């Protein structure tokens, strides 16, 4: 979808070269399209089949030629075909009409639910907000999830890296965050599927419908818009679909003045797509074969994710680390932009501790006394030191048993186990699987609960009372119920 075209639109050019997803196009003298303009081919190939393709201008080569990257497959294109300058960048629909729908990089619906009745469209390329528009005072973004709010709090308008393998609960955590921002913050979410599996994209859509995040009966009551450019798409689509999702999120922030969650899965694929077309665009490869513009490309995307005085975009980005090498230029460049990391741990998931967020590996720049306050900071550090001591003692316990520990260490282990259990929490979006009502826990309740456990006030309660509850009051009530059942 392309915005209303200016007078220069409609200039016809001729395709002179096609190499994979990259086209060289010749235009009449003095009528070259601008960088980032969308070019459109609508014709028939030699077999008589319809060919419809959009490409984005990347370079002006001289001799009245431009080089463009295709947003879909270039099958069927031949030299000499006509291609038209639309006179504007790729534009996508924005606003409430996008909720509950799935779009491709061009803003075209791909969910077979009919056309989108959007009242406005917006170009995917725009500048980051000016410094004068930014909300520079750090503010914690409360998620209602205990382990995140206490140990690795998110910054409103910040960027969070989500690390985790398959099957440890990434999708459920994403769904819960989408649900909580809608209920507690009156906000909406945008999900950008960048270069991941088509099956996962479909599964996510079905799970969103199942959990009520997408209301299939009344799409206007949905809480999320989806924008997909999956693994099977050409690199042009994977390189730009993140910007399409971001543009939809910016409208909710700037026009509707809402708090928005932007999910990008996976930010590494955005970089990978850029590196795929970089050499074809004639650029000299940089370290490990990445594009020389790596820092610029990532920065242009990340700097648009910000908190303004009108609203905020808080971004949660899944980060794939190639060969687990954190020094690889792609993840290393991404880390420079992150305010927090949420690491999901398979060992915790196998114990049944959900969400399986690692309390020791997850980090946040917000966890400092000047931002969160002394009590929150002290409680978080005490929780981490208790869990760290428990981790150190686990080898001794495995070899010699619990009885060989000193009195102090036994007390630490007992409290650490309760803390670990209390870091679990029933989710709203998982109610249909667990049969337990979801819980949103306020930050003050979270801090108070962990303080009571660490102070020894609840040493007399059984461990099981702390598992999959919301606030500490629920743990006490569960303990009474357990005691009554065992009498």
Curated annotation (Swiss-Prot):
Answer whether the UniProt record assigns the keyword Translocase to this protein: yes
Q: Choose one Gene Ontology CC annotation of this protein and give it.
A: proton-transporting ATP synthase complex
Question: Where is this chain primarily localised?
Answer: membrane
Q: Residues that bind ATP, according to the entry?
A: 164-171
Enumerate the InterPro entries for this protein: AAA+_ATPase (IPR003593), ATP-synt_VA_C (IPR055190), ATP_synth_F1_bsu (IPR005722), ATPase_a/bsu_AS (IPR020003), ATPase_alpha/beta_chains (IPR050053), ATPase_F1/V1/A1_a/bsu_N (IPR004100), ATPase_F1/V1/A1_a/bsu_N_sf (IPR036121), ATPase_F1/V1/A1_a/bsu_nucl-bd (IPR000194)
Family, according to the entry, reads as follows: Belongs to the ATPase alpha/beta chains family.
Q: What is this protein called?
A: ATP synthase subunit beta
Native source organism of the sequence: Parasynechococcus marenigrum (strain WH8102)
Lineage of this protein's species?
A: Bacteria, Bacillati, Cyanobacteriota, Cyanophyceae, Synechococcales
Gene from which this protein is expressed: atpD
């Amino acid at each position: 979808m392309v915005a209303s075209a200016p007078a220069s639109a409609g200039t016809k050019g001729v395709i002179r070269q096609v190499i994979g997803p990259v086209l060289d196009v010749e235009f009449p003298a003095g009528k070259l399209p601008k960088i980032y303009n969308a070019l459109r081919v609508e014709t028939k190939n030699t077999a008589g089949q319809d060919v419809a393709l959009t490409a984005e201008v990347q370079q002006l080569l001289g001799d009245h030629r431009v080089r463009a990257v295709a947003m879909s497959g270039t099958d069927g294109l031949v030299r000499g075909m006509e291609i038209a300058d639309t006179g504007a960048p790729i534009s996508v629909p924005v606003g409430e009409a996008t909720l509950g729908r799935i779009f491709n990089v061009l803003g075209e619906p791909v969910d077979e639910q009919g056309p989108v009745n959007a009242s406005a469209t917006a170009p995917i390329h725009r500048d980051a907000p000016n410094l004068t528009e930014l909300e520079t005072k750090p503010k914690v973004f409360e998620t209602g999830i205990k382990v995140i709010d206490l140990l690795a709090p998110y910054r409103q308008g910040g960027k969070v890296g989500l690390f985790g393998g398959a099957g440890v609960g990434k999708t459920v955590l994403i769904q819960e965050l989408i649900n909580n921002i809608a209920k507690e913050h009156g906000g909406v979410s945008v999900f950008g599927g960048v270069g991941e599996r088509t099956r996962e994209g479909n599964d996510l859509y079905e799970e969103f419908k199942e959990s009520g995040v997408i209301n299939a009966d009344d799409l206007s009551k949905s809480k999320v818009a989806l924008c997909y450019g999956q693994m099977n798409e050409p690199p042009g689509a994977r390189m730009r679909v993140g910007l399409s999702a971001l543009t939809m999120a910016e409208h909710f922030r700037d026009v509707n003045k809402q708090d928005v969650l932007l999910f990008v899965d996976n930010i590494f694929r955005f970089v990978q797509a850029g590196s795929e077309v970089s050499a074809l665009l004639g650029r000299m490869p940089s370290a490990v074969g990445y594009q020389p513009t790596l820092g610029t490309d990532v920065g242009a995307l990340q700097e648009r994710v910000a908190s303004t005085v009108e609203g905020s975009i808080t971004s949660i980005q899944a980060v794939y680390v190639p060969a687990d090498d954190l020094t690889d230029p792609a993840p290393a460049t991404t880390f420079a932009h992150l305010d927090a990391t949420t690491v999901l741990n398979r060992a915790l998931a196998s114990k049944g501790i959900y969400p399986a967020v690692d309390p020791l590996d997850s980090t946040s720049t917000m966890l400092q006394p000047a931002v969160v306050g002394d009590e929150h900071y002290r409680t978080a550090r005490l929780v981490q030191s208790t869990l760290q001591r428990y981790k150190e003692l686990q080898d001794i316990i495995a070899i010699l048993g619990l009885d060989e520990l000193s009195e102090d260490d036994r007390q630490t282990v007992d409290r650490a186990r309760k803390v670990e259990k209390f870091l679990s929490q029933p989710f709203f979006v998982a109610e249909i699987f667990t049969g337990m009502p979801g819980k949103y826990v306020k930050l003050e309740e979270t801090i108070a609960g962990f303080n009571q456990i660490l102070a020894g006030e609840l040493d007399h309660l059984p461990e099981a009372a702390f598992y999959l509850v919301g606030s500490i009051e629920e743990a006490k009530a569960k303990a009474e119920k357990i005691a009554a059942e065992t009498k």
